[in-house]
Amino acid sequence: MTQLSERPADRPAGRTEITGPHQSDVYDVWEPAPHRARGVSVALIHGGFWRERYDRHHLAPLARALADDGFHVANLEYARAGMPGGGWPGTGASVLAQLTAVHADPALPERVVAVGHSAGGHLALWVASADRAPWLTGAVALAPAADLGEVDRLGLSDHAARNLIGAAPDDAPDTWADADPARQRLTTPAVIVSGEHDDDVPASVIESYLATRTPDDPIHSAVALGADHFAVIDPQAPAYLLVLAEIEELTLATH
């Protein structure tokens, strides 16, 4: 992985919710101005190739921007590989539990869109599959590690997928199948937004995932021209307008 954005959020989170006993059981909330509120919660799932050293804080600028544009935003933490409760299936269960907590938060709208970046995009698509969260409004996957088989074939980020699963595909085929949204039925409307010049999650990862979809699957994809892996989470980059438009379109289409 290259570098993560270190730009601080101009406005800090309004509150932080603790959802369990581990340091990963937490999410930060940014609220929109009342006159701009859309009645939709966006739950951000950060990337970092499922590794412990990357946390939610690099998505704070995106959280602030989305709140300024009218969304209630929860920036999720979750258990990554090497942490208590992390690895597979723990990482998936951690994200699903955090999203469920956001959905149940009485101060947030019940309509929840999961927006994940990179490894978080993989997790957003995973939650949107196999009827895991029938209450979820939609999923927006930004530069997602969508096909774990292709991620492993390319050896991305020093074989990050094997680090997540804890084994090679031939040694744990059922675990790989459970973790891979490319091998599961999509049951929640989803959008993929990728950067034209993404070297961290190459286009073949997106293409191989899309090749597993049927014409009836509720998904479409868009490419941010000129964007790299991190431009799709940078509110100061032109790609942000595309990301915002896709979130808006998804929430309107599923209303």
PLM feature spans:
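Short, surface-exposed "cap/lid" segments of acyl-processing enzymes
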Residues: 34-37, 42-65
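Conserved alpha/beta-hydrolase "acid-adjacent" motif
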Residues: 199-205
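Catalytic nucleophile-loop/oxyanion-hole region of alpha/beta-hydrolase
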Residues: 53-63, 74-110
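N-terminal cap/lid segment of alpha/beta-hydrolase-fold proteins
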Residues: 1-35
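C-terminal catalytic histidine-bearing segment of alpha/beta-hydrolase fold enzymes
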Residues: 207-210, 214-255
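Short beta-strand/loop motif that positions the catalytic acidic residue
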Residues: 186, 192-194
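Glycine-rich nucleophile elbow surrounding the catalytic serine of serine-hydrolase chemistry
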Residues: 116-126
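Hydrolase active-site cap/lid region
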Residues: 126-171
